[in-house]
Amino acid sequence: KQKFLKVLYENFYKSYNPKAADRLGVIYTPNEIVRFMIESTNHLLYKHFGKTLSDKNVDILDPATGTGTFITEIIENTIPKQDLAYKYKNEIHANEVAILPYYIASLNIEYTYKQKMGYFEEFSNICFVDTLDNTLPMSYGKQTNAFSLTSENTERIKKQNERKISVIIGNPPYNANQKNENENNKNREYPEIDKRIKDTYIKNSTAQKTKLYDMYSRFLRWASDRIDKNGIIAFVSNSSFIDSRTYDGFRKVISQEFNELHIIDLKGNARTSGERRRKEGGNIFSDLIRVGVAVYFLVKKEGENGFKVYYNVINDYEKAEEKKEYLKSHKLKDIDFAHIIPDKDNNWINLAENDLEGLLPLYDKSNNHNSLLNLVSIGVSTNRDEWVFDFSEKTLLNKMRYFIESYNSKV
């Protein structure tokens, strides 16, 4: 039922408003991903904090809920019936920026609750708001749509902002830019979040051209600021943060803000070619997007020092259905993760070999007393190269004779 509803919504939205669908990243999340993320989050919650998603004082937020997929899965298969009424009323939260999925999510969540509990209860913790505008504690949502300004919705946002969020889980939009400038379909600006990105991720980057205003970068920055002092962020998104040069500052910053990271790299990057493209395999979103995808879990623990990265990558050449089956048949605790130790340049994979840095340099411009050579020159160089090649052999021979004769006449 969930898959049917999500596919129906996705196809309708793309036909009804294709630009909004593209800008908002309207792609439904496969159930295999949703269940794996929820089960893994539950495992990490218990491992690190001795709690589960069904416990009191564990507030859960889906910041880009779409049709409510993550919330309905939590209600239907994660929280026991005896705990659900309290969680539903107080500690499960969802945000949605578009009116159509907002209504679908509300109905979907309420129907799932009724099916499990046997009676209807309005879900009053879903907010019609652009999460990225809700930059605590500066505002209770700056969205200009009139619906967001109703007193009921404003009170919902205010109530959510007063909660300490322990788990942020979901599938944030990935689409960073339209395909070309003529599409007139750019993502809007978010001054507060973009400033936070500039002051953190970009400030700590060594890349000459660093553009980190992708939607998923914004949601990661927002979630990192919103999560409680003890909590977990569980996202599925573009995987470029794993090895992209422009994300070196991001990798450095999260090592300072979090204590543990688990990554399952699902590959699927279609923006490659040749053998590399074949190794990437199918995209787990049924090849509806072209970027590589990763599922990851960030753990934040108050008073704990250090940062550990655990990395698992899917096998080469696997099809989308094989990747879904991998998530369906594996538990996070049973996955064979590699413990990654970042290098000095904040690389996680494709680590740089730094052995040469300890050797005596041939020449050091800044300190020639600590080098093998103390003089340097540009060596043999050529000039007037156009004199020594030509399309005609006869013309070339004539040029060279003239060149040699001219030189000898000056000696």
Spans of model-derived segments:
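SAM-dependent methyltransferase catalytic region
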Residues: K3-I264, S273
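Sequence-level detector for compositionally biased, low-complexity segments
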Residues: S124, R163, N180-N182, K203-T206, ...
